[in-house]
Every structure is written in structure tokens, then in C-alpha cells.
Amino acid sequence: RLGKSKVKAVRKEEDLSEELTDEGFGSIVVIANVFGFKQVIPLAEGDNVIGRRCVGTVINTPIETGDMSMDRRHCIINVKRNKAGKLVYTLRDAPSLTGTFLHNEVLGDKDRVRIEDGAIMTLGATSIILKAGK
């Protein structure tokens, strides 16, 4: 099985459009790299625990990747609506071993940072981009 990737291949019929989900809470776009393929993962209201997909790990936003520098519970994006009805996104570290980076700045273990549409986050060697909902 030498050279066989543990990460599944992208199927031709798989829809990789970055359109928002029906719920409209936005999504994260995982940038393709040597560890994995492009993925568009919808976000839900409340805490979205993001990390490396692994059997037995309980997270609601798993990323399929071979990137071992990404923790199984790496960071959390909280999605909620403010009083005006606008979606507010807050990023925090889980905490992770390698740290969570927002625009190449590392977050501390206690940091809570508001993020906007197009925010670039780095988890281990994997980069993700926030696509905000309406």
C-alpha cells in the first residue's frame, strides 16, 4: 500500500462550490495542499469545533487531512446573531499544540477574536478561509 493516500479522492460528481448552505451560517473553505484536497464545510449556529478527522474524536466540523500538525480538536468558530440580526463569527484556539493563526498572527490560549468574511486561518500546515453567511 505504499503511496496510497489515506485521504479520499475528490469524486467528479462531488460539488465543490462555495455556495452557502440552506441554513445560511456560512462555511469554511479548506485550501488543497499536499495533505488533503479542497473541502467546503458548512458552519452551524453555536460552537463549530474544527479539527483533523479521526475515528473516535467528537467534533462537529471535521477536516479530512493527513496533516498531523493539525490537532483533532484544533480551534473553535462560534457563530451567533447580534441584536441587529447580523451574523458574528468568533475564533478561539481549542487549545492546540501548534497554535491557531489568523492572518499569520498566533492566537493565545485565552484569545477570542472576531473574524469577518475572507479571514484566513492556519491550522498546522492547513489553511482555511471563512465564507460568511448573510
Predicted regions and their residues:
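Forkhead-associated
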Residues: 1, 60, 74-76, 80-120
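Conserved metal-binding segment of the jelly-roll/cupin
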Residues: 121-125
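Short coil-to-beta-strand transition motifs
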Residues: 67-72
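Short, solvent-exposed loop/turn motifs
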Residues: 6, 38, 106-107, 127
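A short beta-strand motif that forms part of the nucleic acid-binding face
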Residues: 54, 93-95, 106, 127, ...
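Intrinsically disordered, low-complexity acidic Ser/Thr-rich regulatory segments
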Residues: 1-66, 78-88, 132-134
